[in-house]
Every structure is written in C-alpha cells, then in structure tokens.
Amino acid sequence: MRFTLIEAVALTAVSLASADELAYSPPYYPSPWANGQGDWAQAYQRAVDIVSQMTLAEKVNLTTGTGWELELCVGQTGGVPRLGVPGMCLQDSPLGVRDSDYNSAFPSGMNVAATWDKNLAYLRGKAMGQEFSDKGADIQLGPAAGPLGRSPDGGRNWEGFSPDPALSGVLFAETIKGIQDAGVVATAKHYIAYEQEHFRQAPEAQGYGFNISESGSANLDDKTMHELYLWPFADAIRAGAGAVMCSYNQINNSYGCQNSYTLNKLLKAELGFQGFVMSDWAAHHAGVSGALAGLDMSMPGDVDYDSGTSYWGTNLTVSVLNGTVPQWRVDDMAVRIMAAYYKVGRDRLWTPPNFSSWTRDEYGYKYYYVSEGPYEKVNHYVNVQRNHSELIRRIGADSTVLLKNDGALPLTGKERLVALIGEDAGSNPYGANGCSDRGCDNGTLAMGWGSGTANFPYLVTPEQAISNEVLKNKNGVFTATDNWAIDQIEALAKTASVSLVFVNADSGEGYINVDGNLGDRRNLTLWRNGDNVIKAAASNCNNTIVIIHSVGPVLVNEWYDNPNVTAILWGGLPGQESGNSLADVLYGRVNPGAKSPFTWGKTREAYQDYLVTEPNNGNGAPQEDFVEGVFIDYRGFDKRNETPIYEFGYGLSYTTFNYSNLEVQVLSAPAYEPASGETEAAPTFGEVGNASNYLYPDGLQKITKFIYPWLNSTDLEASSGDASYGQDSSDYLPEGATDGSAQPILPAGGGPGGNPRLYDELIRVSVTIKNTGKVAGDEVPQLYVSLGGPNEPKIVLRQFERITLQPSEETKWSTTLTRRDLANWNVEKQDWEITSYPKMVFVGSSSRKLPLRASLPTVH
C-alpha cells in the first residue's frame, strides 16, 4: 500500500523499495488559473490586457529563461519588444545582490529572526529591494523560508529565518513587503520541504561519488505539511509575494517543480497564489508535465547548464500547437508573470541591468558564455549602497544574542589589555571575497556559502572594530588568530584583562564542499579547533568572553559553564558591519535584546531529526522521512522532556523586565465558513494560429545556445527534437490536466493565504511589562498557545513583539489571536478547525520562561 501525503510516513528502506512502498504524492489537476483575487485585481487586469495582445511565441518567451551564462543576470527571460515588455532579470540572493559590485552584504535571514523585529525585517527587505532595483534586477531570488530548519545541521538554514513557522512566517512576509515596496518582485523560496543539501540533485550527488539516479524525497504527512512547512508560505502569499521558487527535492516522491499536489492544490488552489512559480536552477525535469503541474517559468531555461536545449522555449510552443498543453495554461503563465511585474510597479522603475554576473571586466561580449554579440560595456560599476550600512550595523547589533553574562559586559573601555583570540576575529587572508561564493571558512564568518551570498563591499572584522575601541581609550590590544597556536594563545590570555575569543561554524549550499561538509554540516561542533581555543584562553584568563559566529546552534557543553567564561554572545552571520555591530553591544552602546531563533541542545542527539547522508534506497531516490511530524526544535525538546542549554526564544539583556496582569478578552468575529462554489472557466487570450505563424523570423541572427520560442519547421516533430515525440498522450497526460472548465473552490481556499476567515481576530491578550533595571533596553514578549489534544506540541509560538522601555517604564502590550492561530489542520475535512480540546495561552520572555498563563475561552 502506498503512503499518501495525507498519511504519516515512516519508511526506513535500506535497499530499493518497490513503488507501492514509497511515499506517494496524489495528483491534483487542472492547474488553477489566476483570477485577480485579493489585492491583485488591478495588476491582473493590466496583465490580461497586455497578454491579450501577445502571440503564442511571445507568451512562451516570458516563461522561459534564455540560457545559463548568456545574458547579464543569473536568470533572464525573453521579452516582448513589440509591446514594450523587456526581458526580466532574475538575480540572487536573499541577503543582497549576488555576483555584483558596490552592493551591500546584509545580515542573514537567521539574524533577522534573532532580532524578533518586524520593522527591521521590513526595512532590510526594502533596502535590498532598492539595491536590486538600482542594479537593474527585476526579481530578487529571495527571501527563503525553505529550509525551515528541520535539522540543526541543514546547510542552508541560515538563508531562512527560524525552525518556528510563526516566527519565520511573520518575518518572511515583512521581508517580502519591503522588497516589493521598492519595486522589485520578491521570490518566496524554496517551496517546499527542502531541508537538506545531501541528495538535493542527483548529478551533484553523483559528483560526490553517490550512486543515485534521482533526487532525494522529503516524505511528510498532510498535517505536518500544513502546520509546519506550508505555514510561512501562507504568510508570504497573504503578503502578496509575486513569485515562488519550487525546490530541487522531491516531495513524497514527486519532484518539487512538477508536483501537482504541492503546486496546483496547496499553493494555487488552497493558498490562492496569484503570482508565478519559477523553477530553481536546473530543477525543471519535464516539459509537458511541469506545465500541467503548475510551473510557470523555467530557469535558467536550458535542460542542462549551457546545453542550448530546453524543456520549454520551442518545445512549449510545440506543446500548445499539438494540444498537449492547453492554450489557457500558457496564457495563465504569462498573465501570472505580468501581474507580478505590474503589482510591484516594476514597469515604472525598469532599467536595464548595469552589471554582469560573469565578469568584473568593464567590457565584454553581450552573450558571455559563447562570446557572441557586440563587444560592449557590461559593468557600469553603479554604487547602490545608499546609507544601508547604518541599517546593517543596527541589525547586526540587534541580532546579537547574549547567552551568558556574569557581570562581564558591557565593557567599560578601561580594560588595560584586551586579547583578541581566534581566527574568527580577523580577515580572510585571500580577502573577504577571496573564496568563490564564500566557499571557505577563513577569517571572521559573516555569511555562509553558496548562491545565497553576495560580494562584500568591505568587511569590518571584530579585530578592526575592537582594536579601534581600545586604541581610542589608549589601552593595549593584542591578537592571536592561529587556532592551532595553543601555547601562544595561553601566553596571551595570561596577560589580558579580558580575553575575547572568537569561534565559528559554517555551512552552505551543496555544490561547494568545504572541509568535507557537503553543504550540510557534518556535526554541530565548532570549526577549526574552536573548543580547544576557548579552553586554552579560559584556563589562563578568568575573564574570558566567547563570541560565536555560526550558521545555527553549536555544541557548547564543554565550556559554557566554566566560571572563567564570564560571557557568551552569538553573533550569527551579521554581514559587512560585523565588527562594528559587535562592538556596539560589547561596549554598551546597544543593549542586547535579541532572542535565540532556535534551540541550543546539549548534544546532536538531543535534536533527533537527522539528515539522510547515505543512500537508503539503492540507487533510487534517497528517502528523507519526516517521522517527527510537527515536533522539530523546541517542540521536540518539549515532547521528549529534553532540557536544552539555551531554549528557543532565550536571550539576556543588560537590564531586567517583569511581566504581570495577563488579560484575555473575546472579540466579535464572523463565524467560520468553509469556502465553496466554483471558479470561472479558464480564460484564453488571443488566438493561437498555426505552426507557420511561429517560424524563426526572417533575418534573425541566432545566438549559439540561446533559448528561443520559435520553430525551425512547420513539422512539429522536427521542431521539437524530442525522440519520444508522438507518444500517445493518454500514456502521460494525467486525468483532468487539460480541463479548463469551472472547478470547485477548496474549503480552505478563497483568497491569498487561504480562507479569509482564518485571519479573523478572535481573542485579545494583554500583559504589562516593566523595565526593572537601570538602563533602557528592548524586550521581546512571546505568546505561546497550547492547542490541546493528545498529539499536539506542548506549546507553539503565535505572537511576539520587540518593544523598547526606559528604566522603570512599563507598558501594556496587547496582541490578538486569529482563528488560524488556534486551529489545527483536519486531514479528513481538508480544512482548518478549532478543536474542542481545552486551550491555554502563555506569555513570557522565552519558550521556557513563561510566568503568565490563562485558560482560553471557547471560540470557533
């Protein structure tokens, strides 16, 4: 019997499993067509108006990248010059403009999560959007909430926010709003259940010596999908995200970019997504089935990098002409792309790209990879940084988590001799950008590695910033940055008034192997002898302060409770202003108010939720079974009664706060009604015509390997170049896939983000918070809910806010709980419902420090 998405999955195959034993993703067709619901109406109508004037080839040109390394951006679509529609520039990354110059390198998404600050998330998004816009990029390939962070050693966790879906969802949405308010389309990625680097792409894994033929499959049940991994994407869609990027992995043994259940049903029918779905680069595996399953844009356009062949382009034109892909589906692709373009106002701000992703030379061939086209200026060296360094410094400081403080901080500036110890204090000897895509761990760590990076315009190291502080006060500072020079470290620490020890742990994307870490971390220990560096300093200095730059939690149990370790700070991946933002906290200019966005366990085993790092299904797709369900991070620790070292939401301050006066009030709200009715029939725009209308234009000078939408012959088989052309469509067209008739509206659907009634506010919760210390500071009240039920987490985060209070100041913090906040996913009804189990609310400063609690009244 095959497992479906609606059933719990618990496979432990060690050899090739039969198809009937593998997790199974049920089909869902046809692909829903956009209709302009929510606040998309105006953009949708403009898109319909322009697409109605396009030929089939022009529509196809919007959907297909022109090929890897050919034009200036990492992804580029064709345009419709006749109608004034330019080709669109798509560019990484979630923390700044990748492969460019004179751009900012922002703190990671994980650092934004550590701020717990919605406004900073928005401001960072807007600042990034401004830089993308100024560089001529139309679509930012970010932000990310996939990976969510199921496993603490997942390689790309730092690109996202937090393993908590509510914290991730709010900051994901605010980032998207900021990017799009700057006139750039934001891309919510990687959709969905993309939680490890191992086996994400079969060719990549084969390059590492793994004998597999298909990408790994994330296997999870329907409740886990909705309550955990889909949750932040619902927030993104409700926030108006223009694009969603489907992921490399399979979900229940169906590829992410042709999975009709996750794309057609969950994203488009249930969440009401009105924008377009693009493939991750080379995650497009089939032409017709991808189109019918809900893919709208193929990136970077070619089947294999620089191959000159494409599943779409000419082949998508052929597929419409021969009837295997209905006209309405391609019309819908084009409308979705143009609606996103218009929704953010890109047409008013459009400027051509003024940089090349492939060279820093000022001049080069227009079509880089094939050295064809005019030899022209490709890099204009436009400085787009504005005053964003100030925001970056602020986020860096506001995301620095104070984990321990035995009165050592803040520093006074009167310390006579400051020792700066550890490689992480200093510079990469090759330069801040000396390793391609930051694929090394040399010097201080300010971002992970992979496509989710950006070039630093500069990098202020801790050594530089702290030395400036010490010298300003006319005291002494000495540095030891060789992590294996233990004797010298011990000697320096002996002489110091305070030893600041810098350690790190890195990770990134799977195409880069750093010290045997294939993207994912091999373990949670500190890198480059970090534990021994700390112990050497602490054994010789009774005022040792540890600063951790890492991509997630690390194991600190060897030294965290050493009395000579007087303070511990986690700085995450703070970006270009790393040293300055840290100095602001160390010297008390900024009172730390950050909270850990993940749990710090005593051992790797405490987390469970293991990565699959060896094939477990013969040479078939490795099976990644999410048997823990919704119990990841603090939820799993709570379930297993596992005591962490530092819990989720934990963080100290230079002041103290008191919580009191919890009040709960029921609000008036409409009753919940499942969505019902039917959609309109699929619209079509314009006439298709016949093959003779789509031959290559006379006089066109074709560029080698460039992906075009036209035909080289009216013989469709000859034009397709597909060896299996002519196969009976009944062999591969799923039932209902080409049906453009009216379709039922799902109960959980009805608007962007799902049923609008889910967002009704049902309960108001208020507490009084007082600063009981002597200095001003920020506090983050956190509201958790117990949903009741025998198989539910003990508590789940639902609301939070970062607030600033002066000494002795108190404030009343109020927030609301929506129907969605109190609901569970009902697998049988395929809808959200508030169960009859008793519910409670908890408020406090971390997931394990919740002094206020109350029973919640019954609501529906």
UniProtKB/Swiss-Prot annotation:
Q: Which UniProt keywords apply?
A: Carbohydrate metabolism, Cellulose degradation, Glycoprotein, Glycosidase, Hydrolase, Polysaccharide degradation, Secreted, Signal
Name a GO CC annotation attached to this entry.
extracellular region
GO molecular function list: beta-glucosidase activity
- Locations listed in the record: Secreted
Catalytic activity from the UniProt record? Hydrolysis of terminal, non-reducing beta-D-glucosyl residues with release of beta-D-glucose
Q: What is its EC number?
A: 3.2.1.21
**Active-site residues, record numbering mapped to chain:** D280
Using the UniProt annotation, give all residue ranges assigned to the region (Disordered).
Answer: 719-753
Which residues bear sugar attachments? N61, N211, N252, N315, N322, N354, N387, N442, N523, N542, N564, N658, N690, N712
Q: Which GO terms describe its biological process?
A: cellulose catabolic process
For whether the record's keyword set contains 4Fe-4S, the answer is no
Which Gene3D superfamilies does the UniProt entry name for this protein?
Glycoside hydrolase family 3 C-terminal domain, Glycoside hydrolase, family 3, N-terminal domain, Immunoglobulins
Matching entries from Pfam families are given as: Fn3-like, Glyco_hydro_3, Glyco_hydro_3_C
Top class in the EC scheme? hydrolase
Repressor: present as a keyword of the record? Answer: no
The record's annotation in InterPro entries points to:
Cellulose_deg_GH3, Fn3-like, Glyco_hydro_3_AS, Glyco_hydro_3_C, Glyco_hydro_3_C_sf, Glyco_hydro_3_N, Glyco_hydro_3_N_sf, Glycoside_hydrolase_SF
Domain of life the protein comes from: Eukaryota
Q: Where is the signal peptide?
A: 1-19
Involved pathway(s):
Glycan metabolism; cellulose degradation
- State the family it belongs to: Belongs to the glycosyl hydrolase 3 family.
Provide the function of this protein.
Beta-glucosidases are one of a number of cellulolytic enzymes involved in the degradation of cellulosic biomass. Catalyzes the last step releasing glucose from the inhibitory cellobiose.
Q: What is this protein called?
A: Beta-glucosidase A
- What organism does the UniProt record list as the source? Aspergillus kawachii (strain NBRC 4308)
